[in-house]
A protein has these predicted regions:
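Class I (Rossmann-like) S-adenosyl-L-methionine-dependent methyltransferase catalytic domain
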Residues: 1-38, 43-94, 110-125, 129-194
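Conserved acidic residues
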Residues: 99
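A conserved beta-strand element that flanks and buttresses the S-adenosyl-L-methionine
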Residues: 102
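Short catalytic micro-motifs in class I SAM-dependent methyltransferases
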Residues: 105, 109
Length: 194
């Protein structure tokens, strides 16, 4: 398992581009969200601040103490909070606590053998009929490898893990993306708990 705190301590964080996910920002241009929001694997909180700027109560969690300390040191936008926490050990603390879970490639940062557990925890944290907005790294099924993180995923795997518990409301390949990522490498899904 990757030592996420060490990566933040040593500044070895190529995934941190210094600003919020362009794909999430693109989604927010056409949609709104209301209620409590959880951002797992929030890192330095760029997505947390973007979501909080839309007048939401947003909680960012990360397993890295260093990442959370740095996130807290950045000026507060509005209604955001941060907590050092392991997404896989939040069940009792956050059971049915959120209207939304919004994440940018967090699912792709965890080892594939943890994916089913991720979905179970996600379902437990959402209120009835809660929403899940996710940005996934895409790869053709024939190109999926075990090297990671990130562990890229194909659309068929998204269906396998999520469609049992969620209805798909919308999905798209974002036109906005980090410059270093090729167009078509991200897949945005907006889902609602059944």
């Amino acid at each position: 398992m990757k030592d996420w705190d060490k990566a933040y301590q040593e500044g070895e964080t190529p995934w941190d581009k210094g600003y919020a996910s362009p794909a999430i920002a693109e989604w927010l241009q056409k949609n709104s969200l209301e209620g409590g929001v959880l951002v797992p694997g929030c890192g330095l909180g760029h997505d947390v601040r973007l979501l909080a700027s839309h007048n939401n109560q947003v909680t960012g969690i990360d397993i890295s103490q260093t990442a959370i300390s740095k996130a807290k040191a950045i000026e507060v936008v509005n209604n955001e909070s941060y907590r050092v926490a392991d997404f896989f050990n939040l069940a009792e603390d956050y059971s049915q606590s959120f209207d939304w879970v919004v994440e940018h490639t967090f699912f792709c940062a965890i080892a594939p053998d943890l994916r089913q557990s991720y979905v179970e925890n996600l379902v437990n944290m959402l209120r009835p009929k809660g929403y899940y907005l996710a940005v996934f790294f895409l790869k053709d099924p024939s190109q999926i490898d075990s090297e990671g993180p990130p562990y890229k995923i194909c659309r068929e795997a998204v269906e396998k893990y999520f469609w049992k518990n969620f209805n798909l409301l919308d999905s798209f390949i974002p036109t906005s993306h980090y410059e270093c990522r090729p167009k078509g490498s991200e897949y945005v899904c907006w889902m609602q708990l059944k």
